């Protein structure tokens, strides 16, 4: 057989690995450890797509490489299985979300195993397993005990069609829900919150210690959004009311000409004049229909309504009209801003729209034309005139503190984490509300609080979850006879994914979240690979929970993930018409190398785009494995380009990778394998070992594969192959194409053992040096020949070789040699007359 028969070889080795538990996590205390973590998937109904294996293959290559280097490797997989899609499916079909989820997990696991990933399945976790979410609930009770989980009446993003509130991050820029594209409205509701803001400074500062890309760290820094400035208190004219504004530029207070409150601000109704009451009420209603993202869009038209009230500027006593506008959010800062239109573009546009005064207080611009947002010396600012920014801020803060109407303040953009969902398919929140007005956490001895099985999982419509309908589960009575009611909200999908990497370390422990010694052994995660779309939320939430557990003494490290790598996106093929509209692939035909719309006949432009069901351009890995084999898919996805680049899927590229594996198969099975080394491949082999080792370490898998191809080309030029080089090459390709490598290893090593723990090959530095070198031969100063000679020949040997060359002999025939100058490793110059 002269080709790689993947249909026979791949299932054979997958069966061997499963039977022998080949990838069971090493426990030899004398070995170093390596923890390679994938972002575990949500097991959807559609199964894996070819984007999933890209990151999984990367961590698998590293895991196989580290095992061969003598490491204990922890490489686990599990399921982020709670969440809206399963519940939505269950409501649409009448099926149990638990059954649907179990079927999906079985399908995902089948697909993953077909790709030959070296997971330790003994450590599999499932966030919907009560033995797992017992500890999710335990963490919540600890947060509650420490005052970091609390209830609050907060305006939430309510989605009527989903029957639940969603987090700000789940609202799209157009004001619809990320899940389903439904309208989102603002609605005040009782919600559970987690006080992530208590950790803001640590979450910010500890980023400096992490081996993450600067772009991801910057996204977290911006999300946390630390600002240093001052709180300034404004009194409302003619009342005993006052409100506080946070500003990073208190030095511009003399230029503040109006103030703006969020429509939801608690003062609005109290200070609104009777003349403005109707306009204010209408505006508040309109604002409630918009998401925070829509409201704060810088490009949108400025809207607002005057309340009829005035604030008093604390530094000059001037009256400032108080407006409400939807670009100010009650949940951000104090829900109030002081507007300095001369030096803030949004304030300037608002002032121009509503004909409000603009007073310049920093010199350097023309504030009639646009806001001047650069720094400058202060003007029109009384005792601040002539000062620079730093001096003016220090002076105004001192003044405000002396007057009792302001103080220095650090704030964060980060909001507390809205933690409750009004849905069924999630972890029950382990809290009981008693009729005497108190609330207590469910004792640890009663955890897990198991999610009750029910067929009626439709939202209650009252803002409570379907659990509110389950009276037997809901109502409890204390030993002293006091009646209570269980919390009906469930946790968000983020909960189980915030700590799953810890449970992999000790997944069957019934007494603790995980054993302290094992946590010390394995933490932090050495490399975490996943999509950049999780750059803020999941990673921030996981870091928050980890720091909390560190404070409890549960985990030994301050941070969970030492190195993070975001793989790029694998794009599908798409087609666009003349308007730029995307056309589904089943509406396209290819004729003479061009693409045409089947229905209209219009010629279409081919371009890469994100794979989607609507475009019918999703590639199923099952189809690829069936036709080309898992090893081909693995090699192709790693060879497409840099791991962090977004690259279009290509059938031609897939075929190229398959042909390469066939060449590898033929090289090892067809060449004569020798016990003696003739030295012909010394340089090529040692270069390949060095390059592949270094490129795997730096996650440059595409260039590692390119070097493997270089070796195959070199080896194919030789008649025979040295056995140690054949073995070493098979080891080098094993992390990329493990099934093929296992099969070839048996033909060369004949041990009957897996290649997985065979020591990684090393290179001989001395063999990397060129053993031949090109020299030039000059006659009367002109180059007449170039010769390949052994390195480091003596002057005499060089001269002898040059004079014996046929070309040189022809040039000097009949001439007298006056002198020969030889420079070793460089040239021979022959002087004749």
UniProtKB/Swiss-Prot annotation:
Question: Which residues take part in binding ATP?
Answer: 613
User: What reaction is this protein's catalytic activity?
Assistant: tRNA(Leu) + L-leucine + ATP = L-leucyl-tRNA(Leu) + AMP + diphosphate
**Cellular location(s):** Cytoplasm
What Gene Ontology biological process does one annotation of this record name?
leucyl-tRNA aminoacylation
* Listed EC numbers: 6.1.1.4
One Pfam family hit: tRNA-synt_1_2
Give an example GO molecular function.
leucine-tRNA ligase activity
Q: Where is this motif: 'HIGH' region?
A: 41-52
**What GO cellular component is one of the record's annotations?**
cytosol
Keywords of this protein's UniProt record, alphabetized? Aminoacyl-tRNA synthetase, ATP-binding, Cytoplasm, Ligase, Nucleotide-binding, Protein biosynthesis
Top EC class, one word: ligase
Where does the sequence pass through the membrane?
A: none
**Motif interval(s): 'KMSKS' region:** 610-614
Q: Which InterPro entries does this UniProt record tie to the protein?
A: aa-tRNA-synth_Ia (IPR002300), Leu-tRNA-ligase (IPR002302), Leu_tRNA-synth_edit (IPR025709), M/V/L/I-tRNA-synth_anticd-bd (IPR013155), Methionyl/Leucyl_tRNA_Synth (IPR015413), Rossmann-like_a/b/a_fold (IPR014729), tRNAsynth_Ia_anticodon-bd (IPR009080), Val/Leu/Ile-tRNA-synth_edit (IPR009008)
Origin superkingdom = Bacteria
UniProt family annotation: Belongs to the class-I aminoacyl-tRNA synthetase family.
Matching entries from HAMAP family are given as:
Leu_tRNA_synth_B
- What is the protein name for this chain? Leucine--tRNA ligase
């Amino acid at each position: 057989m002269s080709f790689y028969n993947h249909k026979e070889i791949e299932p054979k080795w997958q069966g061997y690995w499963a039977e022998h538990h080949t990838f069971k996590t090493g426990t030899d205390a004398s070995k170093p450890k390596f923890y390679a973590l994938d972002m575990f998937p949500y097991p959807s109904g559609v199964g894996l797509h070819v984007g999933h294996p890209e990151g999984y293959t990367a961590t698998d290559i590293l895991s196989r490489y580290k095992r061969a280097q003598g490491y204990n490797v922890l490489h686990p997989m599990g399921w982020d299985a709670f969440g809206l899609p399963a519940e939505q499916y269950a409501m649409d079909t009448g099926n149990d979300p638990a059954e649907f989820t179990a079927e999906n997990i079985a399908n995902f696991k089948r697909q993953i195993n077909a790709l030959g990933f070296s997971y330790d399945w003994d450590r599999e976790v499932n966030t919907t397993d009560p033995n797992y979410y017992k500890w999710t609930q335990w963490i919540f009770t600890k947060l509650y005990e420490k005052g970091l989980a609390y209830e609050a009446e907060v305006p939430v993003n309510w989605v009527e069609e989903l029957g639940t509130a969603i987090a700000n991050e789940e609202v799209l820029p157009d004001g619809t829900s990320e899940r389903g594209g439904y309208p989102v409205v603002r609605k005040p509701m009782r919600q559970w919150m987690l006080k992530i803001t208590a950790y803001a400074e640590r979450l910010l500062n500890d980023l400096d210690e992490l081996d993450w890309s600067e772009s991801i760290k910057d996204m977290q820094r911006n999300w946390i959004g630390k600002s240093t400035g001052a709180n300034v208190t404004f009194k409302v004219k003619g009342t005993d009311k006052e409100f506080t504004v946070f500003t990073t530029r208190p030095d511009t207070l003399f230029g503040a000409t109006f103030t703006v409150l969020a429509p939801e601000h608690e003062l609005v109704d109290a200070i609104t004049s009777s003349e403005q009451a109707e306009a204010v009420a209408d505006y508040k209603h309109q604002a409630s229909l918009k998401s925070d993202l829509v409201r704060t869009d810088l490009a949108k038209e400025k809207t607002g309504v005057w309340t009829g009230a005035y604030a008093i500027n604390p530094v000059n006593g001037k009256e400032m009209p108080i407006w409400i506008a939807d670009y100010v959010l009650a949940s951000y800062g104090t829900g109030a801003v002081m507007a300095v239109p001369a030096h803030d573009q949004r304030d300037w546009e608002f002032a121009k729209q509503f004909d409000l005064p603009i007073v310049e207080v920093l010199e350097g611009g023309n504030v009639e034309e646009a806001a001047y947002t650069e720094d400058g010396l202060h003007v029109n600012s009384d005792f601040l005139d002539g000062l620079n920014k730093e001096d003016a801020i220090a002076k105004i803060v001192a003044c405000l503190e002396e007057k009792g109407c302001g103080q220095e303040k650090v704030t964060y953009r980060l909001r507390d984490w809205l933690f409750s969902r009004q849905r069924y398919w999630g972890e029950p929140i382990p809290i009981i509300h008693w009729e005497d007005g108190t609330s207590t956490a469910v004792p640890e001895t009663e955890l897990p609080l198991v999610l009750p099985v029910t067929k009626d999982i439709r939202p209650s419509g009252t803002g409570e979850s379907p659990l509110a309908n389950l009276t037997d589960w809901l109502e409890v009575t204390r030993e002293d006879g006091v009646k209570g009611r269980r919390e009906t909200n469930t946790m968000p999908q983020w909960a189980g994914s915030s700590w799953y990497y810890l449970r992999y370390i000790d997944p069957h422990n019934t007494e603790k979240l995980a054993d302290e010694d094992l946590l010390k052994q394995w933490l932090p995660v050495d490399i975490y690979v996943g999509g950049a779309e999780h750059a803020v939320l999941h990673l921030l939430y996981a870091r928050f929970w980890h720091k909390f557990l560190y404070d409890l003494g549960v985990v030994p490290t301050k941070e969970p993930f030492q190195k993070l790598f975001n793989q790029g996106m694998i794009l599908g093929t798409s087609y666009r018409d003349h308007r730029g509209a995307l056309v589904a692939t089943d509406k396209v035909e290819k004729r003479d190398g061009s693409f045409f719309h089947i229905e209209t006949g219009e010629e279409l432009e081919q371009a890469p785009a994100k794979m989607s069901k609507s475009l019918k351009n999703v590639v199923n890995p099952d189809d690829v494995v069936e036709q080309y084999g898992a090893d081909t898919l693995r090699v192709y996805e790693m060879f497409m380009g840099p791991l962090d680049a977004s690259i279009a899927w290509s059938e031609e590229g897939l075929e190229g990778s398959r042909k390469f594996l066939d060449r590898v198969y033929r090289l090892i099975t067809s060449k004569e394998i020798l016990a003696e080394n003739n030295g012909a491949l010394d340089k090529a082999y040692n270069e390949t070992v060095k390059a592949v080792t270094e490129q795997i370490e730096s996650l440059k898998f595409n260039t590692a594969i390119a070097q493997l191809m270089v070796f195959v080309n070199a080896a194919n030029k030789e008649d025979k192959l040295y056995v140690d080089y054949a073995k070493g090459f098979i080891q080098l390709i094993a992390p990329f194409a493990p099934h093929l490598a296992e099969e070839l290893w048996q033909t060369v090593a004949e041990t009957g053992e897996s290649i997985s723990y065979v020591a990684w090959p090393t290179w001989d530095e001395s063999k990397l040096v060129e053993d031949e070198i090109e020299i030039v031969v000059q006659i009367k100063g002109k180059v007449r020949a170039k010769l390949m000679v052994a390195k480091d020949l003596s002057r005499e040997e060089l001269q002898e070789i040059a004079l014996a060359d046929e070309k040189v002999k022809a040039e000097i025939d009949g001439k007298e040699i006056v002198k020969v100058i030889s420079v070793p490793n460089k040239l021979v110059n022959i002087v004749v007359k």
